[in-house]
Amino acid sequence: MTEKLLHFIRTKSGSMHWWLQRFLAILLAPIILYLLFDVAIYIGQQSDPTVMMFLNRIFNHNSIFIFITSVILIWHVRGGMEVIIEDYVHGEKTRIVSIFLIRVIAIEIMEYLYKCSIIF
C-alpha cells in the first residue's frame, strides 16, 4: 500500500494535481456552507441587519476560519486557472508567463491576507 502511494506521488503525470483540485473542492464545500448558514442565522436573529453587522460577524467571529478558507480557496482558484491556461493558451512563452503571473498573484494575495489577519 505504501509503495503504491509513493509511486503515485512520484509520477510526473497530472493525476496528483487532479486529486488535489478535487480534494480542495470537497474541502471547500462544507466550509462555505457553514459560513453561509452561520451568517444567515445571525442575520435572522437581528432586528435591523446592516452590511457592517454582516462583515463584523464574518471577520471577527470566524477570523482564523476565514483566513484558512481564503487560503484554500485561493490555492484552488490558482490551480484551476493554471489548468485553463495549460489547456487553452497555445504559445509556449505566453503560457509560461501567464502561469508565473498567476502564481505570483496568488502568493501576493496570501501575503496580503496574512498581513490582514495579523491586524485583526
From Swiss-Prot:
The chain crosses the membrane at residues 18-38, 64-85, 96-120. GO terms for cellular component: mitochondrial inner membrane. GO terms for molecular function: heme binding; metal ion binding. Its cofactor is heme. Keywords: Electron transport, Heme, Iron, Membrane, Metal-binding, Mitochondrion, Mitochondrion inner membrane, Transmembrane, Transmembrane helix, Transport, Tricarboxylic acid cycle. It is found in: Mitochondrion inner membrane. Part of an enzyme complex containing four subunits: a flavoprotein, an iron-sulfur protein, plus two membrane-anchoring proteins. This is Succinate dehydrogenase membrane anchor subunit. It comes from Reclinomonas americana. The gene is SDH4.
